[in-house]
């Protein structure tokens, strides 16, 4: 990281936040009227805890360290002060937001443009997986806000003629702990060297790791720390369970759970791209409306999957940890940890996809004979023993034959998909990578399994 600029330690504005948010409005926080109206139009009826803490300090011109759990309203906490300042001193290339993933970058851009639609705010998303030339043209138009992943931004700073950030007024690092965990330290260091020192900096992170502390010392001046949650915890309205399963029956138990909790929306987390794709195909072959989201899909397909799930055109989203943090996915009823996370902290972020904004939700973790130690670490981290989810094992076993048949077709589809990729066939529109399972699915007798009467 860049050498520290002898900045002071963060001021502690991080006492447990007082429960006064019901009396606060965005106007009370100092947000200008036109942006308050935009908040109303987005359905933001009152500010969240992190917004109550961070916005007034940011409007005073302070650097901010925001420690907040997923789904806490972090984007509004930095977007509103930036737009407020932009109204006072209009300027192109006004703010840069660094984010670890492409999907999160697009979501942040959507929120900036929605909040700033009435004042003509323009943003550009600069991420990998998208044509560099079109991004260069977008940068040439000098948008007000740039939302970028560090690697692609460095590419443009080094190679796009005429592009620089020498007049930048605001830097935001969102999901800073994840940016650093993804080995973007070198890129962040380069960015810090080419932007003005006389700027405002907001650093938002779910956790205060040693790397984040080092980044704070290098990048922020006399920051104020706003902490919503200072320890690892899950929300009270989240019902958490586990199921102890022989490894070879994981697919069968998953189908059982989906039938038992039919009518809910599900996010199912898998550890690898391949297993995400395979499981999505398996479920599609059984008639479930499942869709995958993982890093080996093209950017358009990833966004397509996300949008179909958000629009409720699909009720089951299977994902790698790319979707466990940051993404704005409302109304997830059940999270299933099909593959247990190898890092205990990832459990918090995964199950944080449900029971958001005061709603209730369920999280079910599959534990095989190989996962016991990992599961015990999770229980130690959250400070509680999880109850078992009730299952009827005889009913589960009745599903094995049909699930085995669907597994066979899923493997077949996966092989065909791999061969198509090798032949470099044209992208099939906005179809997700499991659409091809439709023909195969009809070969699996009976389609989606119905619950037996009397249950």
From Swiss-Prot:
Name the catalysed reactions: ATP + H2O = ADP + phosphate + H(+)
A GO molecular function term, named singly, is: RNA helicase activity
Q: How does it assemble?
A: Interacts with AGO1 and AGO2. Interacts with GABARAP. Interacts with NOL8; the interaction is RNA-dependent.
| Gene Ontology process terms (BP) | extrinsic apoptotic signaling pathway via death domain receptors; mRNA processing; RNA splicing; rRNA processing
Question: Residue limits of the Helicase ATP-binding domain?
Answer: 55-226
Q: Where is the composition biased (Basic and acidic residues)?
A: 1-10, 413-428
Phosphoserine: residues carrying this PTM: 9, 424
Q: What is the effect of changing residue 107 to E?
A: Found in a patient with a neurodevelopmental disorder; uncertain significance
According to its UniProt record, in which tissues is this protein expressed?
Expressed in skin, lung and breast. Also expressed in the brain.
Position of sequence motif DEAD box = 174-177
Which protein is depicted? Probable ATP-dependent RNA helicase DDX47
Domain Helicase C-terminal residues, every copy: 237-397
